[in-house]
Design a protein with these regions (language model features):
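Short alpha-helical segments enriched in small residues
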Residues: 1-161
Length: 161
């Protein structure tokens, strides 16, 4: 997990579930722009030209944390929770991203997606909805790895979803 505007809330949500230690490797809260480059490998030119609130920044944060933590999946949040605009972006502008494992047969990334959000509400509401949105995107990407038949078999084997 790589977090900016959510400041650790995504990691807190994941680790609130018993047994999370079996699947959760860790998180990086890169609130300061320069940490996005230094810790997560986000392109410095991209940050200088577009700022931290950008879809490519979110995608690079997700890929960077996946690599840094040697995880199968990386997720990231970046955006403007308010009360003031940032990097020319209005309050409520959020980008969430997922970066998934490589397909063994092709070496291509299987799960990779960035979503732009325009959220309303106060700072706390924007941050909460950002957490919900990035976790929903991760679930969507993980579920998309399975074909319909595999998913049906998994549901039967495990007694439901």
């Amino acid at each position: 997990v790589a977090e900016s505007l959510t400041g650790g809330l995504v990691a807190a949500e994941i680790t609130s579930v018993p047994g999370a230690s079996k699947v959760f490797r860790g998180s990086v809260t890169a609130y300061a722009t320069e940490l996005k480059h230094r810790l997560l490998g986000v392109d410095a030119t991209l940050l200088a030209e577009r700022g931290a609130v950008d879809p490519q920044v979110a995608a690079q944060m997700a890929a960077g944390v996946r690599k840094a933590l040697e995880a199968d999946w990386g997720i990231a949040t970046t955006g403007v929770a308010g009360p003031d605009p940032q990097d020319g972006q209005p309050v409520g502008t959020v980008f969430v991203a997922v970066d998934g494992p490589l397909a063994p047969e092709t070496g291509a990334t299987r799960g990779g997606k960035t979503t732009a959000l325009r959220l309303n509400g106060d700072r706390a509401e924007i941050r909460r909805e950002s957490v919900r949105s990035v976790l929903a995107l991760l679930l969507e990407q993980i579920a998309g790895e399975q074909t319909g038949n595999e998913r049906a078999q998994d549901t039967e084997r495990n007694g439901g979803f």
